[in-house]
């Protein structure tokens, strides 16, 4: 099942709560490998002291007009050369528009508006056009981030035209992305994706056909994770609003004449220079918590998971939508049972754990030792102190981890009639406890900022997933036992998609140029990890499993995702 598929889940689909609860607590047992916590987790990795001056912008030795800096933090992780060249962790956001009555529009005209909008956006916020280069570090696989300005207006226009692609096609967004991946794999030497490509597509005869009122137009944003983190989704809304304003004012044929070169002064300042707390003021408490988070992150690859296959596969997403009515019931149940400080993100993470235990039960031999370290990305921007006129869309990612020792003990107790709800209560409380611990410790941000080359070199075996090309080496995952397990550990709460873009797009005149039918995204997974992302749209909860079909089948992926949704629904019965 591809990401355009959406199977609503409604409480009317099953007859009664008791039968539904029974249906999601039983599963035929499966054979599992020993994935228990080792007695000796290994020596603590000591990271070198960071010097902010090592990571500042400076001229590229080969061309002084080009500025560059060393990658740091999560940039180093997602920027490992081979992985980035294959598109590991490239992500997308798809905005579905419907043309309003107040607009004479074609795909060609729409492109001109987006080209102008892109030039304006880059001049104001040049970091959106940075790119990665490799080969200057001692560790050749780690990148530098570079920025190069334009020498002429025509060069700027050519860049923007190359960024914006229009297609008159009946293909879906997932099919268009699959086409691009196929072409990429056909290259003799795979190349990293552009920082950002935008495909504007509609099911019309040609690019100059009028887009009649009510026509669906998709804007597909394709991001290279080296340059963007999840906040890049907000740029999609910014650019659509810019283009809407340009169309409303009929200025799409008037290209800007910016003073290129001046924008360099507006590049995002290096992370270490704008951290809320200076590195040299960190004390023993920081060192202790830092070590704890580091060791926790290193245990992720040893955690319990789902059975793993190793075949060539495709990056896919399964999107499971819960009806608005049922989503409201789930939200109300969380508040009623857990209190106002809890949200559906805590419940969703808890339900993911139960689904994992159901789809791969822990055998008696490891009941006391199997564990789960579940990482989650955290927005690091609250830990920065900087005055900005434009958003920081580049990587500013912190980290946290939910730790569940003796994982089997967190499962559903069969002797309790309310076993599902009680288990979800306990897990949600533990999830929130661990969330709060890391979110109230600046350590989470310090750690990601400290992901230097030395750490990446040590941790790449755990964090880097094997590529599923036919000739790829077959490496072990987790403890390396006879039964490998997929990295199904992470849960990401993306919040409300409504916070990214409004339901309608208006120009300065007040005219409604577009309705916004949908806004959704996903991440390309080329290796043996997988994770659940949760968001809402029009108050309906959506669960998206990002995975690779070479690791486990669509049937297993669908079963796992459906069970997460069913556990969340069971909480409201």
UniProtKB/Swiss-Prot annotation:
Q: What is this protein called?
A: Putative 15-O-acetyltransferase SAT12
Per UniProt, the keywords (alphabetical) are:
Acyltransferase, Transferase
Q: Which GO terms describe its biological process?
A: mycotoxin biosynthetic process
Top enzyme class of this protein? transferase
- Encoding gene per record: SAT12
The record's listing under Pfam families reads:
Tri3
What InterPro entries does its record include? CAT-like_dom_sf (IPR023213), Tri3/Sat12/Sat16/Mac1 (IPR009992)
Q: Which domain of life is it from?
A: Eukaryota
Entry keyword Chloroplast? no
Query: What pathway is it annotated to?
Result: Mycotoxin biosynthesis
Region of interest (Disordered), ranges? 1-40
Tell me which EC number(s) this protein carries.
2.3.2.-
**Compositionally biased region (Low complexity):** 7-36
Show the GO MF annotations: acetyltransferase activity
Coiled-coil stretches are none
Other notes: Trichothecenes are sesquiterpenoid toxins that act by inhibiting protein biosynthesis.
Signal peptide positions on this chain = none
Chain's role: Putative 15-O-acetyltransferase; part of the satratoxin SC2 cluster involved in the biosynthesis of satratoxins, trichothecene mycotoxins that are associated with human food poisonings. Satratoxins are suggested to be made by products of multiple gene clusters (SC1, SC2 and SC3) that encode 21 proteins in all, including polyketide synthases, acetyltransferases, and other enzymes expected to modify the trichothecene skeleton. SC1 encodes 10 proteins, SAT1 to SAT10.
């Amino acid at each position: 099942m591809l990401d355009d598929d959406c199977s609503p889940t409604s409480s009317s689909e099953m007859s009664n709560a008791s039968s539904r609860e029974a249906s999601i607590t039983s599963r035929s047992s499966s054979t599992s490998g020993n994935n228990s916590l080792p007695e000796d987790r290994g020596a603590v990795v000591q990271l070198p002291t960071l010097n902010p001056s090592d990571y500042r912008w400076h001229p590229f030795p080969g061309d002084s007009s080009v500025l560059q800096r060393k990658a740091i933090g999560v940039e180093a992780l997602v920027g490992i050369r081979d992985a980035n060249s294959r598109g590991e962790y490239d992500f997308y956001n798809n905005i579905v528009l419907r043309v309003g009555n107040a607009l004479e529009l074609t795909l060609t005209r729409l492109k001109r508006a987006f080209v102008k909008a892109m030039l304006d956006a880059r001049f104001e916020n040049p970091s959106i056009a940075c790119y990665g280069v490799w080969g200057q570090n001692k560790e050749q696989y780690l990148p530098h981030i570079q920025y190069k300005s334009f020498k002429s207006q025509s060069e700027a226009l050519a860049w923007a035209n190359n960024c914006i692609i229009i297609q008159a096609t009946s293909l879906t967004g997932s099919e268009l992305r699959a086409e691009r991946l196929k072409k990429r794999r056909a290259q003799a030497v795979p190349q990293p994706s552009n920082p950002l490509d935008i495909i504007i597509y509609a099911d019309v005869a040609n690019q100059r056909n009028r887009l009649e009122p009510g026509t669906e137009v998709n804007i597909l944003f394709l991001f290279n994770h080296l340059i963007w983190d999840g906040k890049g989704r907000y740029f999609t809304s910014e650019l659509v609003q810019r283009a809407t304003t340009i169309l409303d004012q009929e200025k799409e044929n008037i290209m800007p004449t910016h003073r290129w070169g001046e924008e360099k002064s507006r590049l995002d300042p290096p992370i270490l220079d704008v951290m809320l707390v200076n590195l040299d003021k960190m004390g023993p408490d920081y060192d202790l918590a830092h070590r704890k988070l580091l060791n926790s992150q290193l245990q992720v690859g040893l955690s319990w998971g789902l059975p793993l296959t190793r075949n060539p596969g495709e990056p896919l997403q399964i999107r499971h939508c819960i009806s608005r009515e049922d989503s409201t019931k789930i939200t109300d149940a969380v508040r009623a049972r857990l209190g106002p400080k809890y949200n559906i993100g805590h419940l969703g993470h808890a339900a993911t754990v139960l689904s994992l235990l159901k789809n791969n039960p822990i055998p008696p031999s490891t009941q006391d030792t199997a564990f789960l370290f579940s990482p989650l990305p955290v927005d690091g921007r609250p830990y920065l102190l900087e005055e900005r006129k434009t958003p920081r869309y580049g990587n500013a990612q912190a980290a946290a981890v939910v730790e569940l020792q003796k994982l089997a003990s967190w499962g559903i107790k069969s002797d309790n009639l309310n076993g599902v709800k009680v288990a979800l209560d306990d897990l949600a409380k533990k999830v929130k406890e661990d969330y709060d611990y890391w979110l109230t410790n600046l350590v989470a941000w310090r750690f990601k900022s400290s992901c230097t080359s030395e750490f990446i070199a040590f941790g790449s075996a755990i964090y880097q997933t094997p590529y599923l090309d036919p000739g790829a080496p077959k490496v072990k995952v987790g403890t390396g036992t006879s039964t490998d397990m997929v990295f199904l550990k992470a849960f990401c709460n993306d919040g409300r998609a409504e916070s990214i873009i409004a339901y309608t797009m208006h120009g300065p005149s007040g005219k409604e140029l577009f309705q916004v039918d949908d806004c959704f995204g996903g991440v390309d997974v080329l290796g043996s990890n997988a994770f659940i992302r949760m968001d809402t749209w029009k108050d309906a909860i959506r669960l998206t499993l990002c995975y690779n079909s070479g690791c486990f089948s669509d049937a297993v992926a669908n079963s796992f995702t459906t069970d997460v949704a069913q556990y969340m629904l069971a909480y409201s019965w």
